[in-house]
């Protein structure tokens, strides 16, 4: 799984949890109503959107920082593991090719 897929899933999980909290919905609705009263020309959903963005921004920033910290700790070992796996795969492929070539030359295993 790619890191971007994990990041998107994590952000969607956070948004789902925050939206499912009743106090969050009530707070956003109250701020939306306050904005609508202050400016009768404003769309109600626009006020709710701005209040939601204002509310969720610190959590998103914290989540991004956490993901960056975790990714920075995992990238170096992952690169080393990938390099090791590539070397092993290369060795195995060379051995298999050598065995196949020997079988073709000798006519197969007649043990």
From Swiss-Prot:
Keyword Secreted annotated: yes
Signal peptide segment: 1-20
Alphabetic keyword roster: Antimicrobial, Secreted, Signal
Cellular compartment(s): Secreted
Protein's name according to its UniProt entry: U-myrmeciitoxin(01)-Mg8b
Any one GO CC term of the record: extracellular region
Function summary: May have antimicrobial properties, like most ant linear peptides.
Distribution of this protein across tissues and organs: Expressed by the venom gland.
Pro-sequence residue ranges: 21-44
Primary location recorded for the protein, binned into one broad class: secreted
Family designation: Belongs to the formicidae venom precursor-01 superfamily.
């Amino acid at each position: 799984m790619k890191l971007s897929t994990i990041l998107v899933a994590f952000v969607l999980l956070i948004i789902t949890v925050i939206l499912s909290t009743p106090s969050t919905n009530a707070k956003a609705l109250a701020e939306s109503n306050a904005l609508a009263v202050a400016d009768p020309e404003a769309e109600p959903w626009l006020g709710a959107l701005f209040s939601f963005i204002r509310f969720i921004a610190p959590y998103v920033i914290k989540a991004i920082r956490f993901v960056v910290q975790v990714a920075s700790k995992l990238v170096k070992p992952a690169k080393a593991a990938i390099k090791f796996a590539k070397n092993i795969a290369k060795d195995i492929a060379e051995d298999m090719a050598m065995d196949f070539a020997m079988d073709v030359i000798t006519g197969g295993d007649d043990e």
